[in-house]
Amino acid sequence: MKPVEMARLEATVVGRVQGVGYRYYVISHATRLGLTGWVANEQHGGVQCVVEGSRPDLEHLLDLLRDGPASAIVEHVAEQWMPYTGRWGSFSIRSSGHSGD
């Protein structure tokens, strides 16, 4: 049996994604998938996510990020894959305007 690849996904979501429950949508799905990391609103109106876990679960979350909740309009999701760090033990919503990890 092949071991599951662990990874880190950094994603920036652009569109009508603030004030529509997008961060709560992300935390709900990330928690259900057993992922760790955080999500935050950005000053320019987008949403940033830094998430760690198994590559298949992260790819599933990425598909969900592209869909968003019914009230959102997702125009673009920029993604960057990084090595897994194991830095977080849970998933959280960070305050608006947070930058860095």
Residue ranges and their predicted role:
Residues M1-D101:
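Intrinsically disordered, low-complexity, mixed-charge
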